[in-house]
Every structure is written in structure tokens, then in C-alpha cells.
Amino acid sequence: MSVAQPRLLFAASGTGGHVFPALAVAEALPEAKIDWLGVPDRLETQLVGDRYPLHTIRVGGFQGSWLLRPLTALRLIGAIFKVRRLLKRQQIEAVFTTGGYIAGPAIAAAWSLGIPVVLHESNALPGKTTRLLSRFCRRVALGFAEAGEYLPGRPLQVVGTPLRSQFYQPSQHGLPIPENVPVLLVMGGSQGAVAINRLVRAAAPAWLAAGLWIVHLTGQQDPDRGQLQHPQYIELSFVDNVAPLLNRADFSISRAGAGSLAELAAAGLPSLLIPYPFAAEDHQTFNARIFAKAGAAILAPQSELTVEQLQQQILDLLRARLGAAIANPLPKMAAAAGKLHVADSAEQVANLLRSLL
């Protein structure tokens, strides 16, 4: 690694699944000067600007026959040239990206200038951008080993999905939950999940009557917020650090984004996973299958799940925790979840970047 302060460009944009792992890696590189490449009006504009210089470009994805669409192609070419100018102006030595739309111009621009790129793919099914452009990257870091099946011949390293340092720092959830009661944590991902919210609210009365406490992270765009009122039901639109809630909960209902799964694994929390059915190429189902196969979770496709089924599944899984004299399946699931955790993921990716400087 060069003696001078290394200069890096992080290209991560859109959802928490792209931005949060990149922030975790950035935290693991305190010696570096990091510039950030994003898109206007996306999550990174809220999270990154106070920490790193943020540069934004407008860019779309590789959806459909984009080469046949002159306007899309021109925008992409324009974005590549803008990133090239940024790389030269900031004297960038290496680029890190977490995939998604922003990765296209970032990888292309860096490759054209001979600047090495590390790409992190968090999902078990790599995205289209990753499959197309990973051949131009010096290293490809994987959240799941299974993703390597779709990337033959690439310079791969399985590192898990990085979590921000605050996830591992002791803190209190600050909620008025009694010490020994069973707690169900419902998470819809960084963008929320209206379908899950409605299923949970419809099923909740039976859970509450049985003695379960529910902490429901609804997302900020939930149209039904406030409709369910109960002393044991706590509704939050967003929390910056979910770790204290994960550590307090007995079980979780969650989407199956790679970031959420990494958090569940880190906390050793068993779960029922409802993959987002409209995710690109249904990639959340691929993620969920790995957790289900390991015994860490139950996979429940949204299209097949009724309120009655969800209600009964949760009651059955938590029956021992609710006081029934039966075997408790949760400790075995929790142990399986914990085995999927990679504690030094961010440091591994940081070391990949250091090795290229």
C-alpha cells in the first residue's frame, strides 16, 4: 500500500442493501480519503454527505435492450465520462462498489483508466450489473459462496456482507418491554413492506392475546400506520441501529435482503422470511433458501401466505416461549443462524482494497 493517504472512490447507491455495506467498509478504512459516488435523491444523500464528499450522477440500469435505446445509451456514456473526470480530478487509486445501477459507469470508467475495482455482491444470485461487469474488476467479494456459481472465472473471495461498526457496539433499545416476555420483531427492509405490514396487523390480535410482544418496523411509507393500537404492540417507522432490537427479540418476520439476513445472522436470530416478490430476478428468494436450508429460517413465499397461516406458524414456533410444556425449536434455529455470520466481513473487504494500493 502506498505511504501517502490512499484515495478511494466508493460507488454505492439506492437502497440500504447497497449503501450500508459500503459504509461498513468505509469505516474499516480510517486511513483512506474516500469520495462517494451516488445518485441524486437516493438514500446516500441522507447518509453519506456528512461523512464523505458526495458526487452524484444520473444513471439508469441495464434493463431490457438498452443498447437499442439511444437516449439510455447516451446517458450511460455521459455518466462514464463524468466518472472518468472525477477519478482523474480526485486522483483515485482504487474503486469499491456494491453493484446496482451506479456500478456500471463506475466500473467502466475505472477500467478505462486502469484503476483497480473491488466489487461486492451481497446476494446469492448476482445482479445483472455484477454478471456483466465483474470481469472488469480486480476482485469480486461475495456475500454468499453460492453466488460464485454464476460468476465463473472471476477472482472471487467469500467475505459475507459487511455490517456497520455500530451494530457491534453495546446499546439499549430503550423500549418499554418487560424483561422476560417473548418478543417478535417484524422488519420490512430499508424501504418497508406494505404487504408484510398488513399481514402482520391482521394476524397480530391472536399473538397479542397469547402474550407475545411485537416490535414492528413499518418503514416510512406505511399507509396504515397507527391503525393497530395495543400496549404490547410497538410501531416504529425506522431505527438507525436495529442491533439492540435483534438481540432482544426471540424471533423475526423479515424480508430476505442480504443486509437484513446479515443482521439476523449476526444476532443469531431465527426468522420467518417473506422474500420481496418483485425484487430483480426474485433474488431475495435465492437468499432465503440458503437460510432455510441451513435451518436458520422458514421460507414463506408472499403469494402463498395467508393471514391464518402466518398466525398459526408464529404461534407454533413460539408456543414453548409462550409457556407451553413442549420442545422449543428456536435455540436450534438460532445456532444455525449464528453459523452464517462472518464477523470480520468489513475488514476482509478493506484488506482487499489495501492489497490493490
Curated annotation (Swiss-Prot):
Cited Pfam families: Glyco_tran_28_C (PF04101), Glyco_transf_28 (PF03033)
Keyword line: Cell cycle, Cell division, Cell inner membrane, Cell membrane, Cell shape, Cell wall biogenesis/degradation, Glycosyltransferase, Membrane, Peptidoglycan synthesis, Transferase
Catalytic activity as recorded in UniProt? di-trans,octa-cis-undecaprenyl diphospho-N-acetyl-alpha-D-muramoyl-L-alanyl-D-glutamyl-meso-2,6-diaminopimeloyl-D-alanyl-D-alanine + UDP-N-acetyl-alpha-D-glucosamine = di-trans,octa-cis-undecaprenyl diphospho-[N-acetyl-alpha-D-glucosaminyl-(1->4)]-N-acetyl-alpha-D-muramoyl-L-alanyl-D-glutamyl-meso-2,6-diaminopimeloyl-D-alanyl-D-alanine + UDP + H(+)
Q: Which Gene3D superfamilies match?
A: Glycogen Phosphorylase B
Q: Got a GO cellular component term for this one?
A: plasma membrane
The record describes its membrane topology as: Peripheral membrane protein
Q: What class of enzyme is it?
A: transferase
Q: Looking at the keywords, is Magnesium present?
A: no
Q: Which InterPro entries match?
A: GlcNAc_MurG, Glyco_trans_28_C, GlycoTrans_28_N
Q: Which GO terms describe its biological process?
A: carbohydrate metabolic process; cell division; cell wall organization; lipid glycosylation; peptidoglycan biosynthetic process; regulation of cell shape
Which EC numbers does the record give?
A: 2.4.1.227
- Places the protein is found: Cell inner membrane
User: What pathway annotation does it carry?
Assistant: Cell wall biogenesis; peptidoglycan biosynthesis
Query: Where along this sequence does the record place binding of UDP-N-acetyl-alpha-D-glucosamine?
Result: 15-17, 123, 164, 190, 284
**GO MF annotations for this entry?**
UDP-N-acetyl-D-glucosamine:N-acetylmuramoyl-L-alanyl-D-glutamyl-meso-2,6-diaminopimelyl-D-alanyl-D-alanine-diphosphoundecaprenol 4-beta-N-acetylglucosaminlytransferase activity; undecaprenyldiphospho-muramoylpentapeptide beta-N-acetylglucosaminyltransferase activity
> Does the keyword section mention Mitochondrion?
no
* CDD domains linked to this entry: GT28_MurG
- SUPFAM superfamilies given for it? UDP-Glycosyltransferase/glycogen phosphorylase (SSF53756)
Q: Which family does it belong to?
A: Belongs to the glycosyltransferase 28 family. MurG subfamily.
User: What is the protein's known function?
Assistant: Cell wall formation. Catalyzes the transfer of a GlcNAc subunit on undecaprenyl-pyrophosphoryl-MurNAc-pentapeptide (lipid intermediate I) to form undecaprenyl-pyrophosphoryl-MurNAc-(pentapeptide)GlcNAc (lipid intermediate II).
Q: Which PANTHER family match?
A: GLYCOSYLTRANSFERASE, UDP-N-ACETYLGLUCOSAMINE--N-ACETYLMURAMYL-(PENTAPEPTIDE) PYROPHOSPHORYL-UNDECAPRENOL N-ACETYLGLUCOSAMINE TRANSFERASE 1
Q: What is this protein called?
A: UDP-N-acetylglucosamine--N-acetylmuramyl-(pentapeptide) pyrophosphoryl-undecaprenol N-acetylglucosamine transferase
Which organism encodes this protein?
Synechococcus elongatus (strain ATCC 33912 / PCC 7942 / FACHB-805)
Name the gene: murG
